Curated annotation (Swiss-Prot):
One of its GO terms (cellular component) is late endosome membrane. The chain crosses the membrane at residues 76-96, 106-126, 146-166, 178-198, 236-256, 265-285. It is found in: Cytoplasmic vesicle, Secretory vesicle, Synaptic vesicle membrane; Synapse, Synaptosome; Late endosome membrane; Lysosome membrane. This is Probable proton-coupled zinc antiporter SLC30A3. GO terms for molecular function: antiporter activity; metal ion binding; zinc ion transmembrane transporter activity. Residues 1-30, 35-54 are annotated as: Disordered. Belongs to the cation diffusion facilitator (CDF) transporter (TC 2.A.4) family. SLC30A subfamily. The gene is SLC30A3. Probable proton-coupled zinc ion antiporter mediating the import of zinc from cytoplasm into synaptic vesicles and participating to cellular zinc ion homeostasis in the brain.
Amino acid sequence: MEPSPTTGGSETTRLVGPRDRGGAGGGLRLKSLFTEAPEPLPEEPKPVEMSFHHCHRDPLPQPGLTPERMQAQRQLCTACAVCCVFMAGEVVGGYLAHSLAIMTDAAHLLADVGSMMGSLFSLWLSTRPATRTMTFGWHRSETLGALASVVSLWMVTGILLYLAFIRLLHSDYHIEGGAMLLTASIAVCANLLMAFVLHQAGPPHSHGSRGAEYAPLEEGSGEPLPLGNTSVRAAFVHVLGDLLQSLGVLIASILIYFKPQYKAADPISTFLFSICALGSTAPTLRDVLRVLMEGTPRSVSFEPVRDTLLSVPGVRAIHELHLWSLTFTHYVASAHLAIDSTADPEAVLAEATSRLHSRFGFSSCTLQVEQYQPEMAQCLRCQEPPQA
């Protein structure tokens, strides 16, 4: 058979007779594959661009030694080494000077060493990946380490306050003013060095995403979030409290060196500056408890988030709105959005997620879209929580 043209421009086939055979062999005359241009291949379909949204603006803290964690480890290791050296010196100096204030400062340095070692352990533990049991990973171990640091300082300070009170009641003690002055001067230098090591500058400049160790501002709030690694921040505040106490001990040692009869300055300085150390750790303790109690992040208010979700086109009501922190710098939100029957659920979900990410910096958002029902207005579980 061979194709034959028709008037319609299509091809038909007919039987090939003997007279159409060419050559001695009488084979079939086939249409050559090379006499006509090959038909063009069909074009591959172009990918269709679709609007895409996801529930994560930035990933939650990833397991492994990130640059921020490596920097925190270096800072804590260096400060811990400095602290150990000068703590040993203060123990010797305090013993030789018979100074309770110097021993108090040494005890605070001991608490610093313990808290820094605990922070290093919790920092290492936080690098472990999430599991089916620990679905958020071990990131909160860092917060627990900060809590242990504050609690240890408060316990040691309470003991030293008691000893200072006993010395104020009984004056049967002697203090070597020269040894106390020398040791106090070294202690001030040691605390200044540790504060310099642990000091954290502002967040590095970054394009496109927010760093792992800081969070953006809430739109219109003007209040920045806590900066820096949690463990380093707690250790830095801890050292600042010790620095204040060391300065007080230095002033007391100068007074005792020139006026030995004023030896009561030793327990008095211990009493006053221990209270300052307690007060300096109160903000850290407050922030830690807020995270552990699943409280609303300090830089995010409930009302602006609620109003932002209600302003999304198609949203009639919201309920089950929960805002909490996984760490000091990673916020999580969840809510139920009740929408009109004519609203597009996917469009509402995409717009609401985008607004939460861009305006408040939530790391993860879980939103459930459902049809609005009139009985929601009377449901107790659909009402807003009262003011604290």
